[in-house]
């Protein structure tokens, strides 16, 4: 089947990018930086820890919530990773590192109410994700792929046509979560969609099947076990990583991938 990206006008909104330098003090606090040209935090080796991130960022949503995120790698193809309920952006760090090594820019972030992000949990995920997409585009992304786990997958599916991304993938997505409804979105969505779910993860196995049936353009993988969302990586890490990277590569322009320069 030939996928055709749906062309929809994005809602106009202003995203305020608020960035500062991380202090190097032992307390790990954030020191303010008044430079209007700074676009990143500077991390010490201790700050980076096991995440492998190259930047820690803070950006603002349309309704003035401050969200914290981590940027991995560089390049003009950006992957925005959205976490599931009860977890935070760190659940995506292993895949973010892997994808950045391939040559993609990757953004993980905490939905409002999670981690250091302000606001009430499990509300207005659409605005949070919209702000995340605006951030990567403001800093050079020419193509964007959304990937989410559970509620993050539902939000990614619903928002994908509105922000005109290249493709969207979801791990164990419910058909709806709060005000976010993925089932309604897929009925008219022509953007490439990838669904991954465990075969014994009720009700999410059934939800993923419903999304697959309703969607016009879908790849569907049902894996053994009962793990949910990013917990699927614990049993199927290599397989899921391979599926995701293959999907991303199929629907993006590989000439935009960052290539590490070598000395001649």
Language-model segments: which ranges?
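Alpha/beta-hydrolase active-site loop
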Residues: 91, 120-139
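Conserved alpha/beta-hydrolase
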Residues: 98-116
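Short beta-strand/loop motif that positions the catalytic acidic residue
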Residues: 189, 195-197
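Gly/Ala-rich beta-loop-alpha elbow adjacent to hydrolase catalytic centers
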Residues: 147-156
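The serine-hydrolase catalytic nucleophile loop
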Residues: 85-97, 206-207
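N-terminal cap/lid segment of alpha/beta-hydrolase-fold proteins
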Residues: 37-72
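C-terminal motif of bacterial Sec signal peptides marking the signal peptidase cleavage site
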Residues: 22-24
